[in-house]
């Protein structure tokens, strides 16, 4: 199925729904691909950015979507998180989907031996990459309840399940993120709030540039996946669209791999 065919099949699927996107940094961001897919399906979106460096990019991209809301937010600051959700509530009157595509680790903690990870670096990676999902989900819950439920979707990677060279502290943070998905799904399920993760294969994004040897990872994956190719951001976006839609109403607590099947291989 081509991207155009997918858009045609999902047009209007999310009409009247609202979403909040954390993690757009560049036009190559997976979060932006997800936002584009949700918008094509009819969802009205709000975006956040952290700092002046990213504000221009987010405003330029989000400005191409009609009716979008753009707000500053540092996910390590509870007051800023509250301000974002208060504004989203005031503007949208509730929320249907939360996209969490936020991760960060110090560059020096993404190479060398994991045992040499600094205490500050470990805590920082956990706070931004894992705990933020809990903080955002908690803040989103009252807005979801106004709409009778909702969908939380986060992004993870195989490095949260297996040792991946030069992923180090981020792999540990992703492992915590994936377990958080399960606990949040159990907590929020009675409120009809679903929580799932997408484990995407390696994709050329701005964030990927910080991983040493990333081009080698791409080449290895292309050769060893069952589909003999790397995935595209649009394929991850289609999965997020599915999880945000009523089509996935019975799915929660899952980590869905979109990696051309690499995760099933034993080598």
Question: Which sequence ranges carry the predicted segments?
Answer:
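Short-chain dehydrogenase/reductase
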Residues: 2-121, 210
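Catalytic loop of short-chain dehydrogenase/reductase
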Residues: 23-32, 103-133, 138-141, 145-190, ...
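A glycine/serine/threonine-rich, flexible loop-to-helix segment
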Residues: 59, 169, 190, 202-225, ...
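Short C-terminal tail/terminal secondary-structure segment
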Residues: 241, 252-267
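Short, small/polar-rich loop/turn modules that mediate ligand/substrate recognition or access, typified
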Residues: 189, 194, 251-253
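Conserved SDR Rossmann-fold cofactor-binding beta-strand/turn motif
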Residues: 194-204, 244, 257-259
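A short hydrophobic alpha-helix cap/turn motif
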Residues: 39, 93, 145-146, 186-191, ...
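A conserved structural motif in NAD(P)-dependent oxidoreductases
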Residues: 225-236, 247
């Amino acid at each position: 199925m081509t991207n155009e065919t997918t858009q045609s099949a999902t047009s209007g699927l999310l009409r009247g729904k609202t979403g909040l996107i954390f993690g757009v940094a560049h036009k190559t961001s997976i979060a932006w691909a997800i936002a584009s897919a949700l918008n094509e399906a009819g969802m009205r979106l709000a975006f956040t950015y952290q700092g002046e460096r990213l504000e221009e990019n987010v405003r330029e991209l989000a400005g191409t979507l009609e009716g979008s809301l753009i707000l500053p937010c540092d996910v390590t600051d509870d007051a800023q998180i509250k301000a974002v959700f208060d504004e989203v509530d005031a503007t949208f009157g509730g929320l249907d989907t939360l996209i969490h595509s936020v991760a960060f680790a110090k560059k020096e903690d993404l190479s060398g031996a994991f045992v040499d990870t600094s205490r500050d670096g470990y805590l920082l990676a956990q706070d931004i990459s894992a705990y933020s999902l809990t903080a955002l989900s908690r803040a989103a819950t009252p807005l979801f309840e106004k709409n009778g439920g909702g969908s939380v979707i986060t992004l993870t990677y195989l490095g949260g399940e297996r040792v991946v060279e030069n992923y180090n502290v981020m792999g540990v943070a992703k492992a915590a993120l994936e377990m958080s998905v399960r606990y949040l799904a159990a907590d929020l399920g009675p409120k009809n709030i679903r929580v799932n993760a997408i484990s995407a294969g390696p994709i050329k994004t701005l964030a990927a540039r910080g991983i040493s040897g990333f081009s080698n990872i791409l080449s290895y994956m292309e050769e060893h996946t069952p589909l003999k190719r790397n995935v595209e951001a649009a394929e991850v976006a289609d999965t997020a669209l599915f999880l945000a839609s009523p089509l996935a109403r019975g799915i929660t607590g899952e980590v869905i791999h979109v990696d051309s099947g690499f995760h099933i291989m034993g080598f």
